[in-house]
């Protein structure tokens, strides 16, 4: 009997050499996939859609494309803290064309979505750090919702502002209850938020490619 590998093993085998190369070169984030990444995308699709290789081959139909798109957004913004409904609506053409993108290795839309994500992270972090200039108002009882997986995307920037205001207030309160002084809290949170932005800014093209390909392989596995 011929062995049929799970989707994630096939993808890992094909992308590992690319990851090692990216670590060695450390390129800046590109606007599109490299030629090698495009080829890998086509190879992974060919293997995962062929019953000779995949344990459970699955076609890239409309339902699967929607699942890939959903998983990719969850990878980037699982807490729905950065994208707005307007952002997600603008990504609709990408969702509709995911099958074509993967089959043809034309992954520019995935990089475009990430570019928007990177911008939104910068905006949100800037807003959060600005809030630290003043101690939150603890005279009102408010609830911060940790698990936001099933909530809708924020309707607009104003909703995100409110979400982040509560998030910063919650972060501040936790440190305050731990006995930290206002200046200590401000310094700690400022570093925390700056580190978040820095970690996103340091992501490379290979990381974006892996995020998207993982969304695909997990959707069909």
Task: List each model region and its residues.
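Flexible, low-complexity junctional segments that flank or bridge functional domains
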Residues: 2-10, 19-221
């Amino acid at each position: 009997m011929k062995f049929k590998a799970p989707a994630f093993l096939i993808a890992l085998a094909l992308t590992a050499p690319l990851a090692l190369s990216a670590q060695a070169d450390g390129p800046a984030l590109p606007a599109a996939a490299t030629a090698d990444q495009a080829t890998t995308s086509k190879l992974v699709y060919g293997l995962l859609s062929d019953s000779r290789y995949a344990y459970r081959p699955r076609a890239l139909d409309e339902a699967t494309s929607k699942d890939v798109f959903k998983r990719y957004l969850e990878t980037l913004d699982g807490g729905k803290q950065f994208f707005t409904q307007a952002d997600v609506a603008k990504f609709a053409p990408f969702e509709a064309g995911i099958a074509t993108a993967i089959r043809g290795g034309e992954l520019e839309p995935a990089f475009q979505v990430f570019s928007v994500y990177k911008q939104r992270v910068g905006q949100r972090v800037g807003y959060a750090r600005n809030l630290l200039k003043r101690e939150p108002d603890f005279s009102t009882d408010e609830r911060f919702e940790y698990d936001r997986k099933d909530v809708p995307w924020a309707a607009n920037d104003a909703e995100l502002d409110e979400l982040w205001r509560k998030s910063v207030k919650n972060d501040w309160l936790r440190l305050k209850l731990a006995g930290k002084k206002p200046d200590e809290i401000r310094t700690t949170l400022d570093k925390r938020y700056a580190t978040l932005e820095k970690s996103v800014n340091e992501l490379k093209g290979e990381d974006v490619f892996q995020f998207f390909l993982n969304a695909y392989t997990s959707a069909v596995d």
